[in-house]
Amino acid sequence: MSQSLIVALDFPGKQDVEQFLRHFEGEELFVKVGMELFYKEGPAIITYLKEKGHKIFLDLKLHDIPNTVKSAMRSLASLDVDMVNVHAAGGSSMMKAAIEGLEEGKQEGKERPICIAVTQLTSTSEAMMKKEIGIEKTLEEAVAHYAKLTKESGLDGVVCSTLEVPKLREVCGNEFVTVTPGIRLASDDVNDQVRVATPKRARELGSSYIVVGRSITKAENPLEAYKTVKQQWEGVTV
């Protein structure tokens, strides 16, 4: 599970990122850059992190018409990021266009970034999905439907809750990538996410990657928290 622990850099700007990364001198991380940080700092934050030797999941959740998504992905691939995502609700044509854009934009001699789709946000409960989004399926059925569509569209995997991983293994196979946010240490608050799990539980359920934010970034000692999460996730002492 080398570098399958992704640290969410949910910070408002580069200064906060620099301060956080001082705890990890010499450590090559797999980090997630989301909307807040990317919209504030732009592509320069990607360049900065790459120069530090980190892998990057650029979490922008694209959802637009196919041609727009294709063009956007072409641009994102040129930044040499390692993972990107879209909303599965955008449909098959949009997801196929995303892959086309990534192939066209990837740097020479390198593989295209891993491309995954969001099924349902981990802040979404089944009651909310039915009442507000208008999907009458169970949450598990809706996620499985989107995951199957994602695989058929040529993407590498999905973002999903750990609770949905076993079902997705049945539907999409063991090679299908599952990236699971909503990971907390047992002692942490769950905050605004509904479907959460510990690193150990994510490992037991078969997640490919876990995304951990506050448990590490808000810790008194981020490096020690990182090591604790990594130990629980990988099942070994680090």
Swiss-Prot record:
GO terms for biological process: 'de novo' pyrimidine nucleobase biosynthetic process; 'de novo' UMP biosynthetic process. Gene3D superfamilies: Aldolase class I. InterPro entries: Aldolase_TIM, OMPdecase, OMPdecase_AS, OMPdecase_bac, OMPdeCOase_dom, RibuloseP-bd_barrel. Keywords: Decarboxylase, Lyase, Pyrimidine biosynthesis. SUPFAM superfamilies: Ribulose-phoshate binding barrel. Pfam families: OMPdecase. It catalyses: orotidine 5'-phosphate + H(+) = UMP + CO2. Pathway: Pyrimidine metabolism; UMP biosynthesis via de novo pathway; UMP from orotate: step 2/2. It is an enzyme of class 4 (lyase). This is Orotidine 5'-phosphate decarboxylase. It comes from Bacillus cereus (strain 03BB102).
